[in-house]
UniProtKB/Swiss-Prot annotation:
InterPro entries: AAA+_ATPase, ABC_carbohydrate_import_ATPase, ABC_transporter-like_ATP-bd, ABC_transporter-like_CS, P-loop_NTPase. It catalyses: D-ribose(out) + ATP + H2O = D-ribose(in) + ADP + phosphate + H(+). It comes from Bacillus cereus (strain ATCC 14579 / DSM 31 / CCUG 7414 / JCM 2152 / NBRC 15305 / NCIMB 9373 / NCTC 2599 / NRRL B-3711). Residues 5-242, 252-496 form the ABC transporter domain. This is Ribose import ATP-binding protein RbsA. The gene is rbsA. Its EC number is 7.5.2.7.
Length: 496
């Protein structure tokens, strides 16, 4: 096992638009190598060229000193290069073993009858070697995302993968699942397996990786060994400038209570939740995965109305039974799943921006092309959206630009309360700072922001107060001076 890969001067254009220009990447046997860059820098495209999904326009790929190009991903996989995408390729209604043997099923001769017992036993043994003890006959839908990720790695190893490419591998994992993943990576690197680690999570990269290659605007910027670089240097290389402090300075002018929930309860999700948000405030919401944070936000927005309890806006009790009720109260909700809930991927930027703003963009009862065009231009400029025009389909945008479109479409209703659920997940460092600046602008105008985040540095860096949820109840509320990673985790896990 073991493989040395060298990619040099790789170029690629789509419809005449250059995506990669003289990109380079090299990985050694048993190395965990981060591939970093802002969204749209060309990281995934470069790896798709390596694995035969896209054909390069120029440059060379050498594997163990021999020039090599794959016709498709299957050919690359057979050669020993596996790509585990952010959206895992696990079929929930199949068993663990069926997922692992998909396309490679063991059969009794040519009868078409599966060797189910043998496949279950092999699957269990493979997973046990990676520290995951589950039955091969168990349905994949019963497993957590972290466990499904280990199954993807086991699938890759069953095809004798020497190089495993992982795209944003920890985006949906709990802290404990991340630890498990890192244990598996460390075990396999000692056996000569190499990992390409595509991520924006700097702390993880400095914890698990040996080296970093940085791309910017499709070009190779440089390679650094982890012990010889710093967070600031990597960020500067990624964005082509120093972005200064990670979190922009906040000048909080906190005013009257704008929103209050009293004893909010949703059966089976959360109970007796009470808290307030004030004008000009960013309220961070922390808690372990499954604690009920998103469920509370969905209740505020009317997706899943409260079974009991009260909601007050500016001191007046209101009933929110649907998103329309929430929008009338100028409440906006940006969900954590932007692709399935926040955007219509086949629509253009302009069409997505118009969706919650049809009333404001109409003259009489007719949608005004002029108003729609102006609104699109204004929002793209305000949020620094990188796109060819407002007619570009949102599915072709980078993750950071997609997130900006989700935020922009809700800014059109001039929200007095903006709820952001995991606002910077899968977003690069430069785009993160722009999103933080938007949050600050809103609060400086006297509006309020609720930010749900699993990244504690983000919660601490941006929040005026932190609401901690534990098993569907309020674990505690911490002021800026009291909040620390330790105090938040103590409340999130049921401590004092």
């Amino acid at each position: 096992m073991g493989m040395h890969i060298e990619m040099k001067n790789i170029s690629k254009a789509f419809n005449g638009n250059p995506v990669l220009k003289n990109a380079q990447f090299m990985i050694e046997t048993g190395e965990v190598h981060a591939l970093m860059g802002e969204n749209g820098a060309g990281k995934s495209t470069l790896m798709k060229i390596l694995t035969g999904v896209y054909k390069k326009d120029g440059g060379t790929i050498k594997i163990d000193g021999q020039e090599r190009t794959f016709k498709n991903a299957k050919e690359a996989e057979e050669y020993g290069i596996a790509f585990i995408h952010q959206e895992l390729n696990i079929l929930p209604n199949l068993t663990v073993a069926e997922n692992m043997f998909l396309g490679k099923e063991l059969m009794y001769g040519k009868t078409g009858i599966l060797r189910t017992r043998q496949m279950n036993a092999i699957a269990q043994q493979q997973l046990a070697e990676l520290g995951l003890h589950v039955r091969g006959a168990m349905l994949a839908e019963e497993l957590s995302v972290g466990q499904q990720q280990i199954i993807e790695i086991a699938k890759a190893l069953m095809t004798n993968a020497s190089v495993i490419i992982m795209d944003e591998p920890t985006a949906a994992l709990t802290d404990r699942e991340i630890e498990t993943l890192f244990t598996v990576i460390n075990k396999l690197r000692k056996e000569g397996v190499s990992f390409v680690y595509i991520s924006h999570r700097m702390e993880e990269i400095f914890s698990i990786c040996d080296a970093i290659t940085i791309l910017r605007d499709g070009e190779y910027v440089g390679k650094r060994l982890i012990p010889e670089t710093s967070f600031d240097e990597v960020v500067s290389m990624m964005v082509g400038r120093s972005i200064g402090e990670r979190y922009p300075e906040r000048n909080s002018q906190i005013g009257d209570v704008i929103f209050e929930m009293r004893n909010g309860t949703k059966k089976g999700k959360f109970e007796n939740v009470s808290f307030q948000v004030r004008k000009g405030e960013i309220l961070g919401v922390a808690g372990l995965m499954g604690a009920g944070r998103t469920d509370i936000m969905k209740a505020i927005f009317g997706y899943e109305p409260l079974d009991s309890g009260q909601i007050f806006i500016n001191g007046q009790e209101v009933k929110i039974d649907s998103p329309i009720d929430a929008i009338r109260q100028r409440i906006a909700f940006i969900t954590e799943d932007r692709k399935s809930e926040g955007l219509v991927l086949d629509f253009s930027i302009r069409e997505n921006l118009a969706l919650p703003n049809l009333e404001n963009l109409s003259k009489g009862s007719v949608l005004s092309n002029e108003l729609e065009q102006q609104f699109t231009e204004d929002m793209m400029k305000l949020l620094n959206v990188k796109a060819s025009s407002g007619e570009q389909a949102v599915k072709s945008l980078s993750g950071g630009n997609q997130q900006k479109i989700v935020i922009a479409k809700w800014l059109g209703i001039h929200p007095q309360l903006l709820i952001l659920d995991e606002p910077t997940r899968g977003v690069d460092v430069g785009a993160k700072k722009e999103i933080y600046s938007i949050m600050n602008k809103l609060t400086e105008q006297g509006d309020a922001v609720i930010m749900v985040s699993s990244e504690l540095p983000e919660v601490l860096g941006m929040s005026d107060r932190v609401l901690v949820i534990h098993e569907g109840k309020v674990g505690g509320i911490l002021g800026k001076d009291e909040a620390s990673q330790e105090s938040i985790m103590a409340l999130a896990t049921g401590g004092e």
